[in-house]
Amino acid sequence: MSEQKKETPSYRIKHIGIRTDSPEEARQLAVILSALLDLGEVNETPIACWAGSLFEVMNSDARGQRGHVALQTEDVEAAMAHMQAKGVEFDEKSIRRDETGRICFVYLKLELAGFQFHLTT
């Protein structure tokens, strides 16, 4: 019997999370990014200011020394299996599940250049 080669999951950057030191700095940076890239009005939440859907400018203690990168994939569980085969570990406490019980969000236990990474659908 021949083994079928598993297809490599596809990824795309869903958004970039950028850490700042204060809500004021977060808002200022989100306004600049939004104006520069014509991303529309800044959307403020209790922990971040969003410049469109591309930049989540965090105003509180957030993961990663500099922030995080959200990687979107069609099947988070398949992507996890693919990465686990390469030795990547995941923060089990960060797992979120969809209405069917499948994992739809998880942080990697990996920080590169000050950025943490998470998978999402």
Question: Where on the chain are the PLM-derived regions?
Answer:
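Mid-chain, well-packed structural core segment of small domains
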Residues: 65-95
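Non-catalytic surface loops within mature trypsin-like serine protease
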Residues: 22, 73-75, 110-112
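Residues in flexible loops and secondary-structure boundaries
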Residues: 21, 26, 65, 79-81, ...
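N-terminal beta-strand motif that seeds the catalytic metal site of vicinal oxygen chelate
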Residues: 1-28, 64-71
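Vicinal oxygen chelate
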Residues: 2-9, 35-42, 53-59, 84-121
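Short beta-strand micro-motifs in enzyme catalytic cores
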Residues: 46-48, 67, 102-106
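Amphipathic alpha-helical segments
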Residues: 23-37, 79-87
